[in-house]
C-alpha cells in the first residue's frame, strides 16, 4: 500500500465504520494472484465494482431525470452517458488519487496500470459500493452528486460529447431494421498505452473503422467513420 487509508478517507471525506470494505475496494484481482498467503483475508474489488456500477448508473439517471424535466429519452440518455463514461469516472478517481492507493500485482504495476482509465473507473465504482454498504445511499449521494453536478456544469458550457454510436444505431435501425455491432480488429502498443482498432458492421457489411486508447473510444471512432461514409454525420 503506497499511502495510508486515513489519508484517503480524509480526501473522500468519509469515515468508514468497517475499513475492510475500503481495503477490498482498492484490491485489484491481480494482487491476490501474487499474494497466496493473503487470499484468506482479502477479496478483489470485482463484486464491489459490480454493485458500484449499478449505484452510479442509478444516481446519474435520477439526476438527469430531475434536472431536465422536459427532455426526451434520447437527450436524457446522452447526458447520463456523459456522466458515467469511463473517462469521467477515471477523472473522479484521479481527483482522490485512487491509483496510488490501489493494491496491484507487480506486473500490473510495471505496466503503468495505476493510471489506466478503465482500472481507475472500476476502482472508483468499487469505492462507491464500499461507501454504500458502510454508510448507506444518502452518504453516496453526498459524495457523488457534487462530482456529477460539476461535470454537468462543465458539459453545459462546452457541450455534450457527440455519441456517434447512438447516432449510427438510430440510423441503421431506421434504414435496415438491425443494430450495428463492433468487432476488434487489432490491439497494439505497450500494455500501459494500448491502441485498439475496431470495425463497425451492419450484418456482415463493414461500415467503418476507428482507433482509440480504449475499446469504447475506438468504437466511437468507428461509428464516426461509418457516419462519414454514409454521409450522416452532423
UniProtKB/Swiss-Prot annotation:
GO terms for cellular component: cytoplasm. Its cofactor is Mg(2+). Residues 163-232 form the DRBM domain. GO terms for biological process: mRNA processing; regulation of gene expression; rRNA processing; tRNA processing. Its EC number is 3.1.26.3. Residues 189-234 are annotated as: Disordered. The gene is rnc. This is Ribonuclease 3. Residues 221-234 have a biased composition (Basic and acidic residues). Keywords: Cytoplasm, Endonuclease, Hydrolase, Magnesium, Metal-binding, mRNA processing, Nuclease, RNA-binding, rRNA processing, rRNA-binding, tRNA processing. Mg(2+) binds at residues 49, 122, 125. The active site is at residues 53, 125. Pfam families: dsrm (PF00035), Ribonucleas_3_3 (PF14622). Residues 5-136 form the RNase III domain. Belongs to the ribonuclease III family.
Amino acid at each position: 500500500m503506497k499511502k495510508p487509508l486515513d489519508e484517503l478517507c480524509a480526501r473522500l471525506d468519509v469515515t468508514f465504520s468497517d475499513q475492510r470494505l475500503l481495503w477490498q475496494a482498492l484490491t485489484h484481482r491481480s494482487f491476490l494472484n501474487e499474494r497466496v498467503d493473503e487470499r484468506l483475508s482479502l477479496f478483489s474489488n470485482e463484486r464491489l465494482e459490480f454493485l458500484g456500477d449499478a449505484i452510479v448508473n442509478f444516481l446519474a439517471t435520477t439526476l438527469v431525470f430531475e434536472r431536465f424535466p422536459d427532455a426526451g429519452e434520447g437527450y436524457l440518455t446522452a447526458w447520463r452517458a456523459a456522466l458515467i463514461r469511463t473517462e469521467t469516472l477515471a477523472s473522479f478517481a484521479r481527483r482522490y488519487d485512487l491509483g496510488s492507493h490501489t493494491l496491484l500485482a507487480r506486473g500490473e504495476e510495471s505496466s503503468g496500470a495505476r493510471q489506466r482509465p478503465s482500472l481507475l473507473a472500476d476502482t472508483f465504482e468499487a469505492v462507491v459500493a464500499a461507501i454504500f454498504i458502510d454508510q448507506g445511499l444518502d452518504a453516496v449521494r453526498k459524495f457523488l452528486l457534487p462530482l456529477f453536478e460539476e461535470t454537468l456544469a462543465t458539459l453545459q458550457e462546452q457541450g455534450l460529447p457527440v455519441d456517434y454510436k447512438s447516432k449510427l444505431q438510430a440510423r441503421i435501425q431506421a434504414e435496415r431494421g438491425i443494430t450495428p455491432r463492433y468487432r476488434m480488429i487489432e490491439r497494439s502498443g505497450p500494455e500501459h498505452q494500448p491502441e485498439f482498432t475496431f470495425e463497425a458492421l451492419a450484418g456482415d457489411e463493414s461500415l467503418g473503422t476507428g482507433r482509440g486508447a480504449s475499446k469504447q473510444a475506438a468504437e466511437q471512432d468507428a461509428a464516426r467513420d461509418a457516419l462519414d461514409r454514409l454521409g450522416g454525420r452532423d
